[in-house]
Regions:
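A short helix-loop-beta-strand connector motif used in the catalytic cores of GNAT acetyltransferases and
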Residues: 12-27, 45
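Residue-level signal for alpha-helix termini/capping positions
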Residues: 18, 73-77
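C-terminal "cap" of GNAT-fold acetyltransferases
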Residues: 77-91, 96-118
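Conserved beta-hairpin
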Residues: 22-36, 41
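Conserved acetyl-CoA binding element of GNAT-fold acetyltransferases
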Residues: 41-54
Length: 118
């Protein structure tokens, strides 16, 4: 079921990407299976980061974030990468160098603004 969700998300993002190519996307595969992906819109808005639960805590998310930072560093109009994190992922983003950039918003699962400055 989770792989189906990943496949459907990647397919819908691919359609979006074909029409809006100002950004970055990358997939992380192991033995031909996509186990994670990242999407950054307009070279500054990290909109999607996902790693399958069985592959979390092996550095895949960190590698995907670093690839996005490297790709967007020179093209980001704000020289920053921004995102809104759930409370679940907040510690991860702090560990990879993001700083909270505003107050948390009351949303299901949390909504904490973060940014990474280049």
């Amino acid at each position: 079921a989770t792989q189906f969700l990943i496949d459907e998300t990647i397919q819908s993002l691919s359609v979006w990407w074909d029409k809006n190519s100002s950004g970055f996307q990358s997939k992380y595969s192991i033995e031909g299976e996509i186990v994670g992906f990242i999407v950054v819109k307009d070279f500054w808005n990290l909109s999607h980061l996902f790693v399958l639960p069985n592959y979390q805590r092996f550095g895949i998310g960190k590698a995907l974030v670093q690839s996005a930072i490297d790709a967007c560093k020179e093209r980001s109009p704000e020289k920053k990468l921004k995102l809104n994190s759930s409370t679940y992922a907040a510690d991860f983003y702090k560990c990879v160098g993001f700083r909270q950039s505003g107050p948390s918003l009351e949303r299901p699962g949390g909504c904490i603004p973060y940014e990474y400055s280049y």
